[in-house]
Amino acid sequence: MANIFIGNSIPPYRIDTYNVLAKMGFSMYFYSDRDPDIVNMDALLELCEFKPTYLQGKQLGRMSRTICFGLWGIIKKEKPKVIIVPEFQIVLWQILILKWLTCSKFKIISMCDDSYDMIANDNDFSRVHKWLRRLVPRLVDDIILLDVKAKDWYQEHFQKGIWLPILRNDDLESDKYRKVLPRSIEIAAHYGLSTTKVILFVGRLVKVKNVSGIIEAYARMTEHCKLVIIGDGEEMNDLQALASSISKEVLFLGRIEGEELRAWYNIADVFVLLSTLEPYGAVINEALLAGNRIVISQKAGACCLVSKDNGEIVDPYHIVETANALDRQVRMAGDKKEIRFRPSLMKVSFQERMNYLMQRLQRIRLGL
């Protein structure tokens, strides 16, 4: 007998959580053996402490619109007490129908990426998603949410909601950042950044990430620093043209992942995420674990990880406000005499959240 977890794919920022779920007795099922944002998937799979099983199905456009085959056979085999499903996707409705048709007793938990901004400011993916937000909580036993304010909203309206932000294992990540420090020192020397303050952005270069807003805010800053942009996407050429029009240098590095990316987090002093639509923003956890101070959009779910102790939350449409916040955070990062290992600035513990999840799942299994 095992519980069942169903996910889209295996992104690097969820590996630690998935490993814990497997240890808690979940069989791990996924739509795909590839994550569209990861190049070296084989290296990522080596970090899995479980054997993933890939579902057969028919994809109707995006991966999230997948009709899965053989679900009843899996349920009969595993005999689960709990099934965790992704968001409000087709597989949720398949599981609900199977439960109703067979009068099964297993509990259903949906993992939902809603940020509070999406809920409160009508900043949704679609009208359908907005409608489903009102329906699905009435049909499932609980909902796992990334944003603590979104969790509070679900608790208020449906008396359901488990806060589980995307977090990496603090201790494991600390060791990894320390391990790549020699590479960080080497890279910083190559680019002349050993004693220069660095503002870092990591992500897709698409409109909702508002990288143009970051460049415009950087142009208005008074503190001496360098903006480094890691990522690729459809806006690359336009962003490079914008960067060439300002009087400061912007370093575009393209797509980087794995240890090389960790090395850049060690080099950075301030991390910026200025998205206009961002359900969460897993990069914020990565940056905080590396000791980066944060300037984050109030639209991002991960702003629940940021306080005055480790950064600032800004309106992504206010460029002057963002520039001032970046100046303040660069100053608060202190003098930079060398590239060194820094303690984490995370205020939320991975193990604490996993222990909380374990307790909640036990209560759900018991029907409490």
PLM regions: where:
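Membrane-proximal helix-turn-helix segments that form the acceptor-binding/catalytic region
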Residues: W93, L101, S126-I143
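A short, histidine- and acid-enriched strand-loop-helix "catalytic/donor-clamping" loop
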Residues: F106-S126, D141
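Donor nucleotide-sugar binding/catalytic pocket of nucleotide-sugar-dependent glycosyltransferases
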Residues: R133-R183, L193
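Nucleotide-activated donor-binding/catalytic signature segment of Leloir-type glycosyltransferases, i.e.
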Residues: Q240-I256
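Short alpha-helical donor nucleotide-sugar binding micro-motif in glycosyltransferases
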Residues: R255-I256, A263-A268
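Aromatic "clamp/platform" in nucleotide-sugar-dependent glycosyltransferases that forms part
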Residues: T276
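Short hydrophobic beta-strand element within catalytic cores of glycosyltransferases
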Residues: R293-I296
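Conserved acidic donor-binding segment of nucleotide-sugar-dependent glycosyltransferases
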Residues: K308, E312-V320, D327-A333
